[in-house]
Swiss-Prot record:
UniProt: dimethylallyl diphosphate binding residues: 103, 181-182, 218, 225, 235, 245
Gene from which the chain derives: GGS2
A GO MF label: dimethylallyltranstransferase activity
Binding sites annotated in the UniProt record for isopentenyl diphosphate: 55, 58, 87, 104
EC number: 2.5.1.-, 2.5.1.1, 2.5.1.29, 2.5.1.10
Pfam family, one: polyprenyl_synt
Annotated organism of origin: Zymoseptoria tritici (strain CBS 115943 / IPO323)
Annotated site residue numbers, Important for determining product chain length: 126
The reaction(s) this protein catalyses: isopentenyl diphosphate + dimethylallyl diphosphate = (2E)-geranyl diphosphate + diphosphate; isopentenyl diphosphate + (2E)-geranyl diphosphate = (2E,6E)-farnesyl diphosphate + diphosphate; isopentenyl diphosphate + (2E,6E)-farnesyl diphosphate = (2E,6E,10E)-geranylgeranyl diphosphate + diphosphate
Stated family: Belongs to the FPP/GGPP synthase family.
Residues annotated as binding Mg(2+) 1: 94, 98
Identification of the protein by name: Geranylgeranyl pyrophosphate synthase 2
Matching InterPro entries: Isoprenoid_synthase_dom_sf (IPR008949), Polyprenyl_synt (IPR000092), Polyprenyl_synt_CS (IPR033749)
Length: 332
């Protein structure tokens, strides 16, 4: 084995290095004879999810923003790949924290590979994504990556805290959480694109637009989780109720009826019973929370389209983004 006795910091005494594992100083990696096999193990849970693509909304949004930002092709490919890796890795952790059964119509990765291996795979991909981003050779990228991963975990941490303690947030606190959690990866992509591209407007305008889109996307997801039958096959029927999640419609209903513990009681059960879930949805309808949520979604979508025109400033390049927003609003 490697003998480090008597060495100073930064120095290693010469000694015997195991023939089974050699340190490659050229790229700070540890090479093994079966590295490819190791990678299959390490990436197994990630690949399980990555092989089942989602809606690819983030990739489409990156392309839409690129109409304005004109990022070099090679840099754009790196940013897209980093966002894809981070998104799927974060879903691996989300599914564990939410005890989800399904993801994209298949068993969640931790049910196939185990919780410990899935956590390790997600963390491994976080650092692979950082390594990928560093190939752009711009230290600002690492600062952006760090800031937005902190924001993502801040938002996720508050979401989990409210769920685990049965604390219903205010609407404003919920929107702040979503801006951190869901807006984080949208912002990471757009901030990196602003650095690599040629923005015609202030970077802050593009970033604000990205945050608004993230909030719109999450509230749409909250609404459809409770109302859209297509979610049943991919994620399960009204899964947010089983998770005990304070989603946007539920926050509105509880805050509108502070003396009624009905929804609190259902969330605490983490029920899988379809009949109980249907009764909860009926309660949301009676409270007007689903209609209220629809109204907020339409208002947000309008705000996004208005800001997109302001950012575009007459360039005629906003249509791709508008098309995405309009597709998101279908069947609402």
């Amino acid at each position: 084995m490697l003998d480090v006795r008597g060495s100073l910091p930064g120095q290693v005494n010469t000694g015997t290095i195991s023939p089974y594992r050699r340190i490659d100083r050229s790229n700070d990696t540890i090479g093994t004879s079966d590295l490819a096999a190791d990678e299959q193990v390490l990436l197994g849970p990630f690949n399980h999810l990555d092989a089942r693509p989602g809606k690819e909304i983030r990739s489409q949004l990156i392309d839409a923003f690129d109409s304005w930002l004109q990022v070099p092709t090679a840099s754009l490919a790196v940013i897209k790949n980093v966002v894809r890796m981070l998104h799927n890795a974060s879903l691996l952790i989300d599914d564990i924290q939410d005890n989800s059964e399904l993801r994209r119509g298949a068993p969640a990765a931790h049910h196939a590979f185990g919780t410990a291996q899935t956590i390790n795979s997600a963390n491994y991909v976080y650092f692979r994504a950082l390594r990928e981003l560093s190939t752009l050779h711009n230290p600002v990228m690492v600062q952006i990556y760090t800031a937005e991963l902190l924001n993502l975990h801040h938002g996720q941490g508050m979401d989990l805290f409210w769920r685990e303690t049965g604390t219903c947030p205010t609407e404003s606190r919920y929107l702040e959480m979503v801006g951190n959690k869901t807006g984080g990866l949208f912002r990471l992509a757009i901030r990196c694109m602003c650095v690599e591209g040629s923005p015609k407007q202030s970077s802050a305008d593009y970033i604000r637009l990205a945050t608004m889109i993230g909030i719109l996307f999450q509230i749409l997801d909250d609404f459809r989780n409770l109302t859209d039958g297509s979610y049943t096959s991919s994620k399960g029927f009204c899964e947010d109720l089983t998770e005990g999640k304070f989603s946007f419609p539920i926050v509105h209903a509880i805050r509108s009826n502070p003396g009624d513990s009905f929804l609190h009681d259902i969330l605490r059960q983490h029920t899988d019973d379809p009949a109980v879930k249907k009764e909860a949805v009926s309660y949301l309808e009676r409270c007007g929370s689903l209609i209220y949520t629809q109204g907020v979604i339409h208002q947000l979508a309008g705000d996004v389209l208005t800001l997109a025109d302001e950012v575009d400033a007459g360039q005629g390049r906003a249509q791709a983004l508008k098309d995405i927003v309009q597709r998101l609003m279908v069947k609402l």
